[in-house]
C-alpha cells in the first residue's frame, strides 16, 4: 500500500486558522481547544457526552454544493482528526468582552440563568445551535422581528442534554423560550429587561436577535478546501505519521486491514467516537481508522420497499429522514428523539449503535425498535458481502473490528391494518438516560368476518435493555398470539409466556422490576388492539369524562410555566434590588477563569489518583499493565514522598479529626487514594492510573464494616461533639403514657447523594522560592486548605498561599473532601520542583467524594385520636464512613429540622457509625434534609394509622410560638418573626388547594393506570452565624476593590457584596449607592491577603460577608465624611471621583478592614418555608411527573431577590434529585458503581415541575439580622420532600385501587417509601404484579371468560 506523509489537521476555531501536525490520534477536540488555543469556554464536566459542558458548534462545508451544515457536538468525545477542514465555534466565538455579547449570552445573563457558570458556555452553544438549525429550516414561516423560528417546546428541548446543578433550570428555560415566536413574554420569569407586573413585556426590550449574525464557516477555509479537491481525489490513501487513517472506499479499508502493521489490539475503527462515552477506553490506541469518508456508508436510499440507511448516518439525520415517512417510520423517529441528547445524536451513528449492541452488553434502544420493524443489515467480511435479519445479526458471536456494517434497511409497512408502538422506561423522559427496559411491537391485523373483532395475523414483539446481552424477539408469545383476537384471557396468557422469556442475567439491577416493565409494555400494546372502546377502557382505565381524556396531552411535552411573587424594597438600595449576578456575562461567554482555565505554567506536570478497589487490605505493591499510557508515567507519588517534617494528612479540621492523604500501609476503604500518577499530560495521567495493578493482602485484618448494621454490631462509632449534641425535649415516657395510639419500631432508610458540582475537584500547585508554594484551588475552605497543606508538607502556614477566584459548584463537596487534591499536588510539586496540576475525571471524583450521609431510622411515636402527637423516640443510625469529616456534628441538624413539629416530648439515641467506605461529608442542607424527611414520614404514618388527612395532622402538630421557643430556645427569636404557620396555611388551607385536591381525587377515580397525589410540607431550618472578615479598598480613580472571607460558588456572594459596598459608601455620592455599583470589583480569596476567611457554607456566608463589608464601609465613611463636608462647603455637590482624589492627596487611609463577629446573644436564627407539589405516577412503569410545585419561602428582607430566587429554585430541584432519582449505588465492597453521567442521573430540564411557582415573602424586620435578611442557600432544599410526599399519596391511591398490601404493615394505605423513590421503588410499591392480578380479575368477572381487553 502506498504510504504518504500525513497532512496536518487544519480547522478554524472561532474564525481563526489552526494547524496541528503529528497530533496523537486519540486527541479529542476538547483537549486540543483547551491546550492549543486560547479557548476555555468548553469545559470537561464528564468526558462521556453526558453533561453538555463541552458543547461546541461544528460546521462542515461541501465544496461541491457550496453548502455549510452546522450541528452541535460534544467536544469531549469528538476526535480532533474527525473535524479536519471543519470550523468550530465556541461560546467565545459567538460573543465576548471585546466584540460584544451575543443575545443568547445576554438573555441568559438577564434572566438570571447562570450561577456557578461552569455549565453556561455549553448551555449557550446548545441554544445557539438550536437557533441556527431552526432559522435554516426552509419550510418554516419567517418569525416576527426579534424572535427565531424556534417553538417554545423546541427551545426547552434544546438544553435537554445539558446539566446544571445550580439554577433548577427554570430561568434557563425562560431564556431559551424568549427566542420562540410562539411564547407569551408575560409568562417569562424575573429578569433585568422589564419589571414583572409593573411594565409590559415586549420583545424590543430584549437584546435584539437576528439570525446569521455569527459567521460559522470562514471564507479562507472554503478557499483552501476548494483548491485541495483535485489534489485529494488523485492522492493515495492518506496514511499518516500520526496514526489516523481515512480510507475513501471499502477496498481501501480492506487494504488497511490486510497490512501487517494492523492488529485487533492496536486499531480502533471510528465514525463518531461517541461509543467511548459508554465504554471508556482503558488504554490508548496507536492507530485509528475513520470510516466516515467512505461514501457507501453514508447512503440514504428510499423506495417503495423501504428506507436504507448507511451505517455512518447520524441519529439526527435518521430522525430527519424517517420523520417524513409512514406511521412506522414516524414512530421510529419519535423514539430516536429520546436516545442520548441532541449534541450526541448529531454525531452518533445508527450503525455504531447497532454494532455496540452486537459486540457488547449495550442497552440499545435503536436495536430494539429496528428489530421490531423487521430491519435487515448488510455487512462485509473480507470480500464477502452478507445480508442478515437484525435478529440474526444480534445473535451471532461478537463480530471483530474487521467486520464492517454497511447499512440498515427498514422495510415499508404501509399504514393499513398495521399497528406499531415503541416504549421505554427511563429516569428522563427526553432521553439522555439508559432505559430500564425498551420495547417495540408491530402487529398486522384484519377484521374477523364472524365476530367483527380484530384478528392478529402477524406480530413482532421486541424487548431490550432488560439485562440480556442484546435485544430479543419474544417468539413464544408471538406464536401464541397469531390468529387470535385480543381478550383479557389472551393477554393474561401472553403475559405469562412473556415472563418465561424475559430473563435478566445474573447481576442485573432490579430484575423483577424489569420483568414487570416488559409485562406492562406488552399489556399496553395489546390493550390498544381491542376492538371496542368501552372494553378498551377496562384495560386502560380511562373514560370520556376523565381529566385524562379531557387533557389528551403528553405531559412531557408541556412547556414549563412559572410564576414568581416577590416584594421589592428600596430601604437600603441598591441592596434589595434584583440586579444580575456579578460576572455573569463572562461566565456565559466562557471567558470567566476557573482553576483549570489558568494557562499551564512552564514544565507543568499532571496527576491522577490511583485508588483502592478493596475496602480493607494491605497495599503490597503498585505496578502497571504494559501499555501506551503506562509508558508515559514520570513517577508515582505515595506516602513515602511526603517531605521530612510533614504528615500523611489529606484533610484536618479542629476538634473533629483528620484523614490520611495516602493509604499507608492499609487501604481502609474502596476508593481511598493509594498514590498519584504523574505524567506529561492529564490524559496520560488518567489512562496510566487506570492501568495500575494493585497487589492486596487481607492477612491479619478484620472483615470490613460497610453498613450501619455492621457498625452497630461491632460497636464502631464516632463520638458526637458534646457542644453540638442535640438536646431532648420533655419526658418521653410520660408522653407515651398520654397517647391513645402508638406506633412502635417503624423503620425508614435514606441513601446517599453525590454533590455533582459541574466542575470536578481541581488544583494547580506551583513551587516558589524559599520553600514556598502557591496553590490555585477550587475550594470552599481556602484557609483550612492552607493549614492542612502546610501540615502535610511540613512548612509554616505563611509559606503556603491558596488562591480561589471562583468555584464551579460546591454544595459542601469542595470543603474537606477537596483538600486531598491540593495536598497531593503540593507533595508532588515540592518533590519534583515543577508545577503539578490535577483535574479529577468524573469517575474518580464520584468514587472518592463520599456524598451525603446515609441513615437508618427506627421510630416509636405516640398520639391522640385527634392526631396530636404526644411523644417521639428515634434510634438514628448514621453512616459516617472511614473518617470523621463533619459526621460528629451531623446529628444536631437531623434533630433540628425534625423539630419543625411539636412532638410533645422528644427523645433519641444517635449513633454515628465508622465504616470502611469513603467518609461522608456536608452536602447542601446536611442532616436537615434527612431530618425533615424523617419528620414527614412519621406524620404520614400517623395520618395513615388514623385514616386522617395528612395535612390536618401536619397542621395539628405545628408549633405555636411558645412550643417553638421550648424546642429551639434562643434561635426562635421574636414572636413576630415566626411565619411558618402563616405560610403553611397560605398553601394548605387555601380554596385553590382544596379544589386541586378534589381534582386529584376525581382524576384517580377516573384513571386506573395513572394516579396523582398532592401534598404540602412545612420546613424549619436553623442556621448559624460565624465570624467573617471583609476589606474595602478605594483606588485613586474611585474604583473599589473588595475582599471577603467567603468564596463565590455561584450563590451570588460577590453580587450581594457589591450591593452592600455600594450601599455602605452610597451616602458619600450625589447619586447614592446605585451610582457606585459599576465601580465595585470583588476579588479572589487569597489566604495571605485575607486571613481568618473561615468556611463558605451553612448558607450564611453571603450575609456575614456583607456585614463585614458594611462595617468596613462605615470606617471609610467616617474618614471621608469630613473631607466631603469641607468640599461641599466650597463647591457644593461633590462628585465621587473628586472626593477620592482629594482624600488621596490628604493621605487619608482609603482601605478599611473589619472582622465581624455575631452578637453572643444572637448566633443563630430560624428559616421557614412551605411547599406544595402535585405529581402524577404511571402505575405501569413507576415513572413520576411533577405537574406543579408552589413554594413559599421567608427570605426576610432579601439582599437580592433574583439571587435568592435562584437559590430557592436550585436547592429545590437538587432536593428533587435526592428524593426521587439520584441513586448513588455501590458494590458489595462499598465501591461506587454509579460513577458517571451514564448511571447517575441528576435532574434535567424535563424532570423539573411543569409549573414551578415561587413566592418570596418578606417577614417582619429583625435588626439583629443583617439588614433583616435571611439565608436562602440550603433551607429550600427541604421543600423538595413535598414531591416525595405527593408521590406517596399517588402510590396510596394505586395501592387502594389494586388492593396492594405489601410491607410490614400489610396495609394498602400504610407503607414506607425510602429515599430515593426511584422508578423501581415506585413500581414495586404500586405492585409488580398489578397487570396480572387485574387481568385475572377481569377474566374471572367475564361471563364467557373472553372479555375484550
From Swiss-Prot:
Its cofactor is [2Fe-2S] cluster; FAD; Mo-molybdopterin. Residues 7-94 form the 2Fe-2S ferredoxin-type domain. It catalyses: indole-3-acetaldehyde + O2 + H2O = (indol-3-yl)acetate + H2O2 + H(+). One of its GO terms (cellular component) is cytoplasm. [2Fe-2S] cluster binds at residues 46, 51, 54. GO terms for biological process: abscisic acid biosynthetic process; auxin biosynthetic process. It is found in: Cytoplasm. Aldehyde oxidases (AO) are homodimers and heterodimers of AO subunits. This is Indole-3-acetaldehyde oxidase. It comes from Zea mays.
Amino acid at each position: 500500500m502506498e504510504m504518504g506523509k500525513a497532512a496536518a489537521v487544519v480547522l478554524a476555531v472561532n474564525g481563526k486558522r489552526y494547524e496541528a501536525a503529528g497530533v496523537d490520534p486519540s486527541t479529542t477536540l476538547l483537549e486540543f481547544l483547551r491546550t492549543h488555543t486560547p479557548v476555555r469556554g468548553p469545559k470537561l464536566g464528564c468526558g462521556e457526552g453526558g453533561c453538555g459542558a463541552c458543547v461546541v458548534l461544528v460546521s462542515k462545508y461541501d465544496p461541491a454544493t457550496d453548502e455549510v451544515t452546522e450541528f452541535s457536538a460534544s467536544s469531549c468525545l469528538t476526535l480532533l482528526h474527525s473535524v479536519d477542514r471543519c470550523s468550530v465555534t465556541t461560546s467565545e466565538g459567538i460573543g465576548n468582552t471585546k466584540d460584544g455579547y451575543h443575545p443568547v449570552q445576554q438573555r441568559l445573563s438577564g434572566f438570571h440563568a447562570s450561577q456557578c457558570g461552569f455549565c453556561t458556555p455549553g448551555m449557550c452553544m446548545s441554544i445557539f445551535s438550536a437557533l441556527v438549525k431552526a432559522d435554516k429550516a426552509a419550510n418554516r414561516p419567517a418569525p416576527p422581528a426579534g424572535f427565531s423560528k424556534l417553538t417554545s417546546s423546541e427551545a426547552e428541548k434544546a438544553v435537554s442534554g445539558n446539566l446544571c446543578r445550580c439554577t433548577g433550570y427554570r430561568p434557563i428555560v425562560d431564556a431559551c423560550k424568549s427566542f420562540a415566536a410562539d411564547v407569551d413574554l408575560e409568562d417569562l420569569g424575573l429578569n433585568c429587561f422589564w419589571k414583572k407586573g409593573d411594565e409590559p413585556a415586549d420583545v424590543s426590550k430584549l437584546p435584539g436577535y437576528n439570525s446569521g449574525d455569527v459567521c460559522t464557516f470562514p471564507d479562507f477555509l472554503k478557499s483552501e478546501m476548494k483548491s485541495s479537491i483535485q489534489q485529494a481525489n488523485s492522492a493515495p490513501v492518506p496514511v499518516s505519521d500520526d496514526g489516523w487513517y481515512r480510507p475513501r472506499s471499502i477496498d481501501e479499508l480492506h487494504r488497511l486491514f490486510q497490512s501487517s502493521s494492523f492488529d485487533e489490539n492496536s486499531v480502533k475503527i471510528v465514525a463518531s467516537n461517541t461509543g467511548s462515552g459508554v465504554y471508556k477506553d482503558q488504554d490508548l490506541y496507536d492507530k485509528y481508522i475513520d470510516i466516515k469518508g467512505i461514501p457507501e456508508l453514508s447512503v440514504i436510499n428510499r423506495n417503495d420497499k423501504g428506507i436504507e440507511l448507511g451505517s455512518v448516518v447520524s441519529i439526527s439525520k435518521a430522525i430527519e429522514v424517517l420523520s417524513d415517512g409512514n406511521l412506522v417510520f414516524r414512530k421510529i423517529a419519535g423514539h430516536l428523539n429520546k436516545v442520548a441528547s441532541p449534541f450526541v445524536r448529531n454525531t452518533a451513528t445508527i450503525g455504531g449503535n447497532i454494532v455496540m449492541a452486537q459486540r457488547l452488553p449495550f442497552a440499545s434502544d435503536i436495536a430494539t425498535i429496528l428489530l421490531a420493524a423487521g430491519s435487515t443489515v448488510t455487512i462485509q467480511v473480507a470480500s464477502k458481502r452478507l445480508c442478515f435479519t437484525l435478529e440474526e445479526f444480534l445473535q451471532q458471536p461478537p463480530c471483530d473490528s474487521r467486520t464492517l456494517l454497511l447499512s440498515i434497511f427498514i422495510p415499508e409497512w404501509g399504514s393499513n391494518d398495521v399497528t406499531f408502538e415503541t416504549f421505554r422506561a427511563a429516569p428522563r423522559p427526553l432521553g439522555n438516560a439508559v432505559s430500564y427496559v425498551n420495547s417495540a411491537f408491530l402487529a398486522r391485523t384484519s377484521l374477523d368476518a364472524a365476530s367483527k373483532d380484530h384478528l392478529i395475523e402477524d406480530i413482532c414483539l421486541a424487548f431490550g435493555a432488560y439485562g440480556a446481552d442484546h435485544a430479543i424477539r419474544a417468539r413464544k408469545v408471538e406464536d401464541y398470539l397469531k390468529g387470535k383476537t385480543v381478550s383479557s384471557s389472551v393477554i393474561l396468557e401472553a403475559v405469562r409466556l412473556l415472563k418465561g422469556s424475559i430473563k435478566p442475567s445474573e447481576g442485573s439491577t432490579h430484575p423483577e422490576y424489569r420483568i414487570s416493565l416488559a409485562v406492562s409494555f406488552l399489556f399496553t400494546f395489546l390493550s390498544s388492539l381491542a376492538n371496542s372502546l368501552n372494553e378498551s377502557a377496562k384495560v386502560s382505565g380511562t373514560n370520556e369524562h376523565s381529566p385524562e381524556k379531557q387533557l389528551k396531552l403528553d405531559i412531557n411535552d408541556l412547556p414549563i410555566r412559572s410564576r414568581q411573587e416577590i416584594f421589592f424594597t428600596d430601604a437600603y438600595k441598591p441592596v434589595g434590588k434584583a440586579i444580575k449576578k456579578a460576572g455573569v456575562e463572562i461566565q456565559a461567554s466562557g471567558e470567566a477563569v476557573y482553576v483549570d482555565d489558568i494557562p499551564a505554567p512552564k514544565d507543568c506536570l499532571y496527576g491522577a489518583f490511583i485508588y483502592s478497589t478493596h475496602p480493607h487490605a494491605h497495599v503490597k505493591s503498585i505496578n502497571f499493565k504494559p501499555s501506551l499510557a503506562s509508558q508515559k508515567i514520570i513517577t508515582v507519588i505515595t506516602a513515602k514522598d511526603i517531605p521530612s517534617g510533614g504528615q500523611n494528612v489529606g484533610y484536618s479540621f479542629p476538634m473533629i479529626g483528620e484523614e490520611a492523604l495516602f493509604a499507608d500501609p492499609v487501604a481502609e476503604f474502596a476508593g481511598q487514594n493509594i498514590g498519584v500518577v504523574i505524567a506529561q499530560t492529564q490524559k496520560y495521567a488518567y489512562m496510566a492510573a487506570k492501568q495500575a495493578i494493585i497487589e492486596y493482602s487481607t492477612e491479619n485484618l478484620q472483615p470490613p464494616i460497610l453498613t450501619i448494621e455492621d457498625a452497630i454490631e461491632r460497636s464502631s462509632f464516632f463520638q458526637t461533639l458534646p457542644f453540638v449534641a442535640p438536646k431532648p425535649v420533655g419526658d418521653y415516657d410520660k408522653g407515651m403514657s398520654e397517647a391513645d395510639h402508638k406506633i412502635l419500631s417503624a423503620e425508614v432508610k435514606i441513601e446517599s447523594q453525590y454533590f455533582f458540582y459541574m466542575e470536578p475537584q481541581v488544583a494547580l500547585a506551583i513551587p516558589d522560592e524559599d520553600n514556598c508554594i502557591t496553590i490555585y484551588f477550587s475550594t470552599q475552605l481556602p484557609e483550612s486548605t492552607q493549614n492542612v497543606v502546610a501540615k502535610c508538607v511540613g512548612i509554616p502556614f505563611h509559606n503556603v498561599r491558596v488562591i480561589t477566584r471562583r468555584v464551579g459548584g460546591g454544595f459542601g463537596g469542595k470543603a474537606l473532601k477537596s483538600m486531598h487534591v491540593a495536598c497531593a499536588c503540593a507533595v508532588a510539586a515540592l518533590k519534583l520542583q515543577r508545577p503539578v496540576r490535577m483535574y479529577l475525571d468524573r469517575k474518580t471524583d464520584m468514587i472518592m467524594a463520599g456524598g451525603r450521609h446515609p441513615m437508618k431510622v427506627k421510630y416509636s411515636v405516640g398520639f391522640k385520636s385527634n392526631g396530636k402527637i404526644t411523644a417521639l423516640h428515634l434510634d438514628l443510625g448514621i453512616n459516617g464512613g472511614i473518617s470523621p469529616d463533619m459526621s460528629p456534628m451531623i446529628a444536631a441538624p437531623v434533630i433540628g429540622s425534625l423539630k419543625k413539629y411539636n412532638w410533645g416530648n422528644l427523645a433519641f439515641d444517635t449513633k454515628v457509625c465508622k465504616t470502611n467506605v469513603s467518609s461522608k461529608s456536608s452536602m447542601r442542607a446536611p442532616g436537615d434534609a434527612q431530618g425533615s424527611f424523617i419528620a414527614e414520614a412519621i406524620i404520614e404514618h400517623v395520618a395513615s394509622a388514623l385514616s386522617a388527612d395528612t395535612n390536618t395532622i401536619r397542621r395539628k402538630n405545628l408549633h405555636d410560638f411558645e412550643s417553638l421557643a421550648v424546642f429551639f430556645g434562643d434561635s426562635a427569636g421574636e414572636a413576630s418573626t415566626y411565619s411558618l404557620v402563616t405560610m403553611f396555611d397560605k398553601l394548605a388551607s387555601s380554596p385553590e388547594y382544596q379544589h386541586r385536591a378534589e381534582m386529584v381525587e376525581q382524576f384517580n377515580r377516573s384513571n386506573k393506570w395513572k394516579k396523582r397525589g398532592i401534598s404540602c410540607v412545612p420546613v424549619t431550618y436553623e442556621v448559624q452565624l460565624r465570624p467573617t472578615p471583609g476589606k474595602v479598598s478605594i483606588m485613586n480613580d474611585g474604583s473599589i476593590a473588595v475582599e471577603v472571607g467567603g468564596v463565590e460558588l455561584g450563590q451570588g456572594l460577590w453580587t450581594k457584596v457589591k450591593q452592600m459596598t455600594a450601599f455602605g459608601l452610597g451616602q458619600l455620592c450625589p447619586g447614592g449607592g446605585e451610582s457606585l455599583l459599576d465601580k465595585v470589583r470583588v476579588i479572589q480569596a487569597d489566604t495571605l491577603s485575607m486571613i481568618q476567611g473561615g468556611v463558605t457554607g451553612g448558607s450564611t456566608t453571603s450575609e456575614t460577608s456583607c456585614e463585614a463589608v458594611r462595617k468596613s464601609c462605615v470606617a471609610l465613611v467616617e474618614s471621608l465624611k469630613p473631607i466631603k463636608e469641607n468640599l461641599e462647603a466650597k463647591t457644593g455637590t461633590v462628585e465621587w471621583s473628586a472626593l477620592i482624589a482629594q482624600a488621596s492627596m490628604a493621605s487619608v487611609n482609603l482601605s478599611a478592614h473589619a472582622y465581624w463577629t455575631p452578637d453572643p446573644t444572637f448566633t443563630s436564627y430560624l428559616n421557614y418555608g412551605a411547599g406544595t407539589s402535585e405529581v402524577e405516577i404511571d402505575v405501569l412503569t413507576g415513572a413520576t411527573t411533577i405537574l406543579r410545585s408552589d413554594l413559599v419561602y421567608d427570605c426576610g428582607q432579601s439582599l437580592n431577590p433574583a439571587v435568592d430566587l435562584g437559590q430557592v429554585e436550585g436547592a429545590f430541584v437538587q432536593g428533587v434529585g435526592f428524593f426521587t432519582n439520584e441513586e448513588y449505588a455501590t458494590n458489595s465492597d462499598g465501591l461506587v458503581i454509579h460513577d458517571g453521567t451514564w448511571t447517575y442521573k441528576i435532574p434535567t430540564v424535563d424532570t423539573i415541575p411543569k409549573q414551578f411557582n415561587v413566592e418570596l415573602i418578606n417577614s417582619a424586620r429583625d435588626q439583629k439580622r443583617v439588614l433583616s435578611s435571611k439565608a436562602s442557600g440550603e433551607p429550600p432544599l427541604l421543600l423538595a420532600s413535598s414531591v416525595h410526599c405527593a408521590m406517596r399519596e399517588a402510590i396510596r391511591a394505586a395501592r387502594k385501587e389494586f388492593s396492594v398490601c405489601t410491607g410490614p404493615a400489610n396495609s394498602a394505605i400504610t407503607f414506607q417509601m425510602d429515599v430515593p423513590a426511584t422508578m423501581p421503588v415506585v413500581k414495586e410499591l404500586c405492585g409488580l404484579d398489578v397487570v396480572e392480578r387485574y387481568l385475572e380479575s377481569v377474566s374471572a368477572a367475564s361471563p364467557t371468560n373472553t372479555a375484550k381487553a
